[in-house]
Amino acid sequence: MRKLLFFAAALIAAPVYAQSGNNLEIIHHPNYDKSVFMPFSPAIKIKSGKILWLAGGTALPVYHDHPHKREQVLQYLNNDLEAQVRRTMDGVMETLKAAGASPKDVVHVFIFRTRPRMGDIGRSSAVVNSYFAPHNHKPTTTNMAVLELGEPEQLVEIQVVAVVDN
């Protein structure tokens, strides 16, 4: 089971902003053109460590009531995509820290968005990338448009996979 999870995490790697940590290696094709701007890495090889799977995060506080309380939904889930992504990434960063990890340990970011409009991928990716850029790190990334998330007001959910030292 452990090998299967390791293999699955290695397969789903695809980018955001950075040079990798000691246990990660950014993989590029032999014909990689460094003049082309890529906001993510094509692949990340995990050389050692343990896989850390974060639950999907939202703009709601990490610890919130289930089922959701309407007043919390209205307080945190406004109609501002960038604000929801920022609050979500703040929660992701708190969870990474609690697990003894940092943004440089992230190997993959899944971004689920509802109500996609022209430019949403660029806007949401720019906010996500801003959390990795100071660490010169580009995790692999998957952007997906979905029909709906947990609440009608929810515009984004983000899940992260990281690798931490043994």
Language model segments and positions:
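Sec-dependent signal peptide hydrophobic core
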Residues: L5-A9
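N-terminal presequence-like segments and the immediate start of the first folded domain
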Residues: L4, V16-D90, E94-A99, K104-V107, ...
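Core hydrophobic alpha-helical transmembrane segments of single-pass membrane proteins
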Residues: L11-A13
